[in-house]
Amino acid sequence: MSEIKNYRITSTHLGYEILGIFTFYLHLKGADGVHVSVGGYALDSPDTLSTGTLTKRILTVKGATLIAKILDTVGVANWEELHGQYIRVEDNGLGSYITKFGNLIEDKWIDLDDYFKGDPED
C-alpha cells in the first residue's frame, strides 16, 4: 500500500552518468531521516541516424520537456533552486522505486513511469 510522505530535496544531478547517458536525480531526505533518490531515466537517445553506428547521444524532446515539468511541479524557475525545496512523494514501501512525486502545496504531480510509457517523443 502506498503512502504520501514529505521529503526535502538535499541535492540534485542533471548531466551525464558514467556510461554517457544524460539523466537527472533528485536526492531526498524524509522527516524520519530516510534518504532516497528519484530519477535515473535516460533523457537522451543514441544518435545512429547519420552513420548507422553510435557516435553520440542527443537530448530528446521528451527528456527536455521532463526537465521543465519537474521545475513547474516543484514550483521553481531553474534547476539550481530545487535544492532545499520540499515535495510530496508516493512511497510504496521499503525496496520499491519512487516514481511519483508532487508539489508540497498544490495538486501537481509527476508519475515518471506513466510519463515514459509509449512513444519516446510524445
Annotate each language-model stretch with its function:
Residues 1-122:
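Short beta-rich binding modules
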